[in-house]
Curated annotation (Swiss-Prot):
Family annotation (InterPro entries): Membr_insert_effic_factor_YidD
Entry GO terms, CC: plasma membrane
Predominant place of localization: membrane
The family this protein is said to belong to: Belongs to the UPF0161 family.
Name recorded for this polypeptide: Putative membrane protein insertion efficiency factor
The species this protein was found in: Nitrobacter winogradskyi (strain ATCC 25391 / DSM 10237 / CIP 104748 / NCIMB 11846 / Nb-255)
Function: Could be involved in insertion of integral membrane proteins into the membrane.
Localization per Swiss-Prot or TrEMBL: Cell inner membrane
Keyword Ribonucleoprotein: no
Membrane topology: Peripheral membrane protein
Keyword terms of this UniProt record: Cell inner membrane, Cell membrane, Membrane
Length: 117
């Protein structure tokens, strides 16, 4: 059995390992969206009322703001995408919405309107 020299082994607080651990929830959320886009979405049909589609919006929101913030943004978007709901171009915000913190997650989402301020 080979032993790995101590200078090659990852230390306990290695920055690369820490960053990988912090990206794990984000990547798991994006993986779920990828699975939906390649399995269920083709069966149901591509019929989103917004541009970009809700799954593309969710993927971008989670990539930009993490699973917690991006997940709340995606939930708000899915709730707006219904009959008699909003439609049109609705991009992911560039910056985090004002007042959005981890303990006030509802502030991440735009619950009414498209591109509302």
């Amino acid at each position: 059995m080979k032993t790995i020299p101590s200078e090659v082994r990852c230390s306990r607080l290695c920055p690369a390992c820490t960053n990988a651990a912090l990206r794990l929830p984000r990547n798991a959320g994006r993986a779920l969206i990828w699975i939906y886009r390649h399995t269920l979405s083709p069966l149901v049909g591509f019929n989103c009322r917004h541009l970009p589609t809700c799954s593309a919006y969710g993927d971008e929101a989670i990539a930009r703001f993490g699973l917690w913030g991006g997940g709340w943004m995606t939930l708000a978007r899915i709730l707006r995408c219904r009959p008699w709901g909003t439609s049109g171009i609705d991009n992911v915000p560039v910056a985090k919405p004002s007042g959005a913190t981890w303990y006030r997650p509802w502030r991440y989402g735009r619950w009414r309107g498209v591109n509302a301020k």
